[in-house]
């Protein structure tokens, strides 16, 4: 997207990392400045917290995520754009990658026209990149747009493999993947 060429790899990491034991996690005690005063004042986010922005289509979730990406005080922002349309990717890259924050943003983009396996792989790769920077001691903000499209991709794979659908038509593999 940024036309800056290849990225040199310094080390390799497993795509499926080991989850942190919840009992070993530090309690959330510090606020993350997302750069949007209304969110900071009314719905402040803690460093290490997981948050979902849930709303209907066309209400500005992606715009809000791009504003947070540009304005947050996190050291590194990893943005996972999964299942987006081409024009949405172009719009995001124009808004975020052309700003002063581009040096701290890593974008993993897998458009909607790619296979479900690649979309799942893209989401996992973004998480692995975020874990890499976290392990270096950096404050990392991981944004996935859209987790719904990740779940749809996993559902396509699960149903193709013969998994029986459960809640809302999703197979158990989706329900076990999302929390991790």
Language model segments and positions:
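Short, surface-exposed alpha-helical segments at coil->helix boundaries
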Residues: 86-94
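P-loop NTPase nucleotide-binding/switch module
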Residues: 1-49, 54-56, 62-67, 99-114, ...
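Juxtamembrane helix-loop transition segments at the membrane interface in multi-pass membrane proteins
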Residues: 93-106, 156-158
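Short, function-defining helix-loop hinge/capping sites that tune catalysis or transport
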Residues: 43, 91, 153-154
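Conserved P-loop NTPase nucleotide-binding/switch module
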Residues: 59-63, 67-76, 81-82, 86-87, ...
């Amino acid at each position: 997207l940024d036309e800056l060429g290849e990225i040199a790899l310094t080390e390799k990491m497993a795509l499926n990392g080991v989850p942190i034991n919840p009992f070993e996690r530090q309690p959330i005690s510090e606020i993350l400045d997302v750069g949007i005063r209304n969110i900071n004042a009314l719905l402040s986010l803690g460093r290490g917290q997981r948050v979902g922005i849930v709303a209907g289509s066309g209400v500005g979730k992606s715009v809000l995520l791009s504003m947070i990406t540009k304005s947050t005080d996190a050291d590194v922002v990893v943005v996972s754009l999964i299942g987006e349309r081409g024009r949405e990717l172009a719009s995001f890259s124009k808004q975020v990658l052309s700003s002063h924050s581009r040096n701290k943003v890593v974008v993993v983009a897998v458009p909607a026209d790619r296979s479900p396996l690649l979309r799942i792989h893209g989401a996992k790769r973004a998480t692995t990149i975020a874990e890499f920077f976290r392990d270096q001691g950096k404050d990392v903000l991981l944004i996935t747009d859209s987790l719904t499209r990740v779940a749809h991709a996993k559902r396509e794979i699960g149903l193709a493999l013969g998994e029986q659908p459960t809640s809302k038509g999703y197979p158990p593999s989706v329900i076990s993947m999302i929390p991790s």
